[in-house]
A protein has these predicted regions:
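Phosphate- and divalent-cation-binding pockets in alpha/beta enzyme and binding domains
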Residues: 46, 66, 112
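NTP-dependent small-molecule kinase module
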Residues: 94-145
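Conserved AAA+ ATPase "sensor/coupling" helix adjacent to the nucleotide-binding pocket
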Residues: 1-8, 70-77, 119-123
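Conserved phosphate-donor/acceptor-positioning beta-strand/loop module used by diverse small-molecule
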Residues: 35-40, 49-73
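ATP-dependent small-molecule kinase phosphotransfer cores
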Residues: 1-35, 42
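Conserved catalytic-core segment of NTP-binding enzymes
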Residues: 79-94
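Conserved catalytic network of the ASCE P-loop NTPase/AAA+ motor domain
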Residues: 27-30, 48-52, 93-96
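Alpha-helix capping/helix-boundary segments
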Residues: 42-43, 109
């Protein structure tokens, strides 16, 4: 898929390649659906490069210690993997300013985090740059007034 340019983005994350199929995303957008990609920083920046109007949302725990606590408390990762994930998080944090929105995923407040993401999506729909057809139509209707 990489060689055939069938991915919007791809990157290696924790020693594995991950990517987003271009055809699927294009189909969803053509149907008027919103597409949310859960991807790491490398991939997000590649998407933004190819599609500059794409809003990027960085979702993060409020502190590094909270991130480590969550990774540890899951009990699914070895201490070595947790440390590797923390190093990756430190690298990713260097790019937070490249994102359009930062949303804190507070402990025991998942619903608030989801609502914040939904709010961003709703606001993005209302941007004037996404509503040029309406703007043109309204201006045309008001010409004779």
């Amino acid at each position: 898929m990489i060689a055939k340019d069938e991915l919007i983005e791809y990157a290696m994350y924790v020693n594995n390649y991950y990517g987003t199929p271009k055809a699927y995303v294009q189909e969803q957008l053509a149907e008027g659906k919103d597409v949310i990609l859960e991807i790491e920083v490398q991939g997000a920046l590649k998407v933004k490069e190819k599609f500059p109007d794409t809003p990027l949302i960085f979702i993060t725990p409020p502190t590094a210690s909270e991130l480590k606590r969550r990774l540890t408390d899951r009990g699914t990762e070895s201490p070595e993997v947790v440390e590797e994930r923390m190093k990756t998080a430190a690298k990713e944090a260097r790019f937070m300013e490249s994102y359009d929105y930062i949303i804190l995923n507070e402990r025991d407040r998942l619903e608030e985090c989801v609502e914040a993401v939904h709010g961003v999506i709703l606001a993005e729909h209302e941007k004037s740059t996404r509503n040029q057809a309406f703007i043109d139509h309204m201006k045309e209707e008001l010409k004779g007034e």
